[in-house]
Amino acid sequence: MPFQAVLSALLSALTLCVGKFPIYTIPDKLGPWSPIDIHHLSCPNNIVVEDEGCTTLTVFSYMELKVGYITTIKVNGFTCTGVVTEAETYTNFVGYVTTTFKRKHFRPSPSACRDAYSWKTAGDPRYEESLHNPYPDSHWLRTVTTTKESVLIISPSVADMDAYDKTLYSKIFLNGKCSGVSQVSPFCSTNHDYTIWMPENPNPGVSCDIFTTSKGKKATKDGKLCGFVDERGLYKSLKGACKLKLCGISGMRLMDGSWVSIQNHDEAKWCSPDQLVNIHDFHSDEVEHLIAEELVKKREECLDALESIMTTKSISFRRLSHLRKLVPGFGKAYTIINKTLMEADAHYKSIREWTDVIPSKGCLMAGGRCYPHHNGVFFNGIILSPDGHVLIPEMQSAMLQQHIELLESSVIPLMHPLADPSTIFKKDDGAEDFVEVHLPDVQKQISGIDLGLPEWKRYFLIGVSALAFLALMIFIAACCRRVKRKKRAKPNPVELIRKVSVTSQSGRPIPSWESYKVETGGQS
């Protein structure tokens, strides 16, 4: 990509062009003019910035974006939901057993989720066993509650990572995003109170595989870093660069929108939120290749124009336009004054809008002012038309304009439009439909005697039973008393015979037979 350095130089203006790309170069310092011979004409070197004076080169390694890097960085993960399964068993008076299963939630710990995920991915039977219902137990006239805690793993669950701050985005995250996963906080909260999200790899930074390591040479002047020569041998300036972290790695965003992992440029400030990094894809590489061919063609056109000037010993404004320097820095400017070829030292700057060059009709902004013309002639082929308009004979090629439009459109969005806050899970106490789980560590709780009735019915039955029992006791006591009384009133058969009373002849009752005999014997 030989044009990458040219584009970098084009964008290394003395004034910061935030998020914009230059379309032309104009001298900000110009003069004085002096006559020259046509043999002093030369085509400018547009490959490097000549005014930085960075001559000390030191070999170093750096990282840059991979070719083919796309905006969306996918991070594979899984959701982990904690579920408590209760097996409630009641055995009634006749031994009939009733078992009821209930499921509730709990918030699982990250370590338990990581272990369960490892079991599931490794095919360990412990994971499937942990999902089984607890084995119920029973006791006569008692309610036995057996609980089992489980964690349900659902995978894959893919999130999108923002390369700028490593923020994760997904519809299931709380508020649609997660500030990132680290050793301190190894999970992300979700819209479900009892579900957490964790990356498949404990170190999610490995998902940010967008960099490649390259070797180059640092260019310094008096110990101060002012640029570097990349792996392709192209010089890139750090003028106008700003500091920017990608996937947690510190680096510099150059003015052409590219990014390199250079960190020791002390004068640079942090990039503003709208200064994004250009996508380095195959399309832009293809366009850059075509632009490089276009620049070679421009160089050949300049040499052809120069050869034509030398051969014909004549010059025109159009031919002078080929000699303009296309990148910021020191160069030459040429004009024709009173039919004399003139040359001046110039320092070129890049401009991003044509209004920066022609702010009003008839005004060519150069050197910080409306530059005066000589009989309708400015310099570098720029002239004044008869109706008073400034005419610039050349602009950047259509191919370069296409590349500029591509760079302006191919930027990484600061936030990914994937968060959908309308998706919320239920938050009731029962387990949702997506949960089918129940886990280890069985706990048994045996209640007291329970007839399986509601509380008021139970107290009512106890009261009725107490009254019935009291009535039964009273009835039994009454029966016993009556039986005892009957036994006491009934005489002995022998005594009954002895106690039979008779009536004497005199009419008086005789209590016994013996008395009767005595009485009758005396009378005789």
Swiss-Prot record:
UniProt subcellular location: Virion membrane
Q: What is the effect of changing residue 267 to A?
A: In strain: Isolate Holland/G9375/1993
* Topological type in the membrane: Single-pass type I membrane protein
Listed Pfam families: PH_Rhabdo_glycop, Rhabdo_glycop_CD, Rhabdo_glycop_FD
Chain positions covered by the region annotation Disordered: 503-524
Q: Which residues face the membrane's Virion surface side?
A: 20-459
Q: Which residues form the signal peptide?
A: 1-19
Q: What is the effect of changing residue 142 to K?
A: In strain: Isolate Holland/G9018/1987
Keyword Membrane among record annotations? yes
Which domain of life, per UniProt?
Answer: Viruses
Record's keyword terms, sorted:
Glycoprotein, Lipoprotein, Membrane, Palmitate, Signal, Transmembrane, Transmembrane helix, Viral envelope protein, Virion
Effect of substituting residue 160 to N: In strain: Isolate Switzerland/G9337/1993
Q: Which InterPro entries match?
A: PH_Rhabdo_glycop, Rhabdo_glycop_CD, Rhabdo_glycop_FD
Q: Which residues cross the membrane?
A: 460-480
- Does Membrane appear among the keywords? yes
What further note is attached to this protein's record? Arg-352 is highly involved in rabies virus pathogenicity. Its mutation dramatically attenuates the virus.
Q: Which family does it belong to?
A: Belongs to the lyssavirus glycoprotein family.
Question: Could you describe the subunit structure of this protein?
Answer: Homotrimer. Interacts with matrix protein.
Q: What is the stated purpose of this protein?
A: Attaches the virus to host cellular receptor, inducing endocytosis of the virion. In the endosome, the acidic pH induces conformational changes in the glycoprotein trimer, which trigger fusion between virus and cell membrane.
What this protein is called in its record is Glycoprotein
Q: Which organism is it from?
A: European bat lyssavirus 2 (strain Human/Scotland/RV1333/2002)
> Which lineage?
Viruses, Riboviria, Orthornavirae, Negarnaviricota, Haploviricotina
